[in-house]
Amino acid sequence: MTRVVLAAAYRTPIGVFGGAFKDVPAYDLGATLIEHIIKETGLNPSEIDEVIIGNVLQAGQGQNPARIAAMKGGLPETVPAFTVNKVCGSGLKSIQLAYQSIVTGENDIVLAGGMENMSQSPMLVNNSRFGFKMGHQSMVDSMVYDGLTDVFNQYHMGITAENLVEQYGISREEQDTFAVNSQHKAVRAQQNGEFDSEIVPVSIPQRKGEPILVTKDEGVRENVSVEKLSRLRPAFKKDGTVTAGNASGINDGAAMMLVMSEDKAKELNIEPLAVLDGFGSHGVDPSIMGIAPVGAVEKALKRSKKELSDIDVFELNEAFAAQLLAVDRELKLPPEKVNVKGGAIALGHPIGASGARVLVTLLHQLNDEVETGLTSLCIGGGQAIAAVVSKYK
């Protein structure tokens, strides 16, 4: 079977809600990365067979945001593109689709990833197409409803985390401790420049003066403690334990990678970073969607012909501290190998981009001693996706 390799992998900094990227469309964030990858690899843009990009909150951006990003990123009009929506798994699903297209021989070179600007998601006025006869009308927050609400139960993703808290007996202190550790690891990594190789700075033009250059993730917080987090009120139910402090944020960002057949990489003298070994997807009861990575991880390992003990580093999306703690109850992961640079609680969770973001961060950790990695994300609606990669040899 054709070996599929990852030849370049980058991400933007992750902006906080209403932060540096509030006026930057998702497709511009994606275009920045496409342009950078072309420049870094020296690849002829016309040699790219397809562009596949995850994006959840598409309303108001225009037709097919992936196509917009591709064209604005400097690709010729002959290169096709399409947009993927698998909620939080969109970015990783896009990479899986690229992988599948190469294995089947349909493509040789694909740009794949994810992008999201949650700050720009519009408010919707449903049923207003033909006007209102009388009475009060309300707006729907597309970010909350299309991105963060379980449509089957009509409640916020945070309630699915609370459901896992009850099922697995997870304490508030456990969650807050997990969140603090995520922040501390991210602070250390940021201060030591450990994200520098994966981040492409984004220049934001200003009406007056020089452009602003965004170089670092905005959500990383110093001086966070369990004591401080313990003062926060529950965010989703009166007697709950999930708070804004032990959950991922609402964020803006993008991540992208160059997916190729090994033969094409050799032909073009492009040195790959890693080999894609296999993927797994799984579904569960939507009310406990956060536990779905257990099944996805098991399937990805089986398809990659690996055991959990073979994995040197894990990058697992931290939708909620409770969610990842529940997954750990089942998989019993070695803590020293999990999210060693911090996770989404600290870095942020731009939903359509996160699937690619966790893989980008993982790839930049591979070396002669850290050769095999696994990444996974839970997905609203009761799903999950996982992938296993190995350092290219």
UniProtKB/Swiss-Prot annotation:
It is found in: Cytoplasm. The active site is at C88, H349, C378. The keyword Endoplasmic reticulum does not apply. GO terms for cellular component: cytoplasm. The keyword Acyltransferase applies. Gene3D superfamilies: 3.40.47.10. Its main location: cytoplasm. Keywords: Acyltransferase, Cytoplasm, Transferase. This is Probable acetyl-CoA acyltransferase.
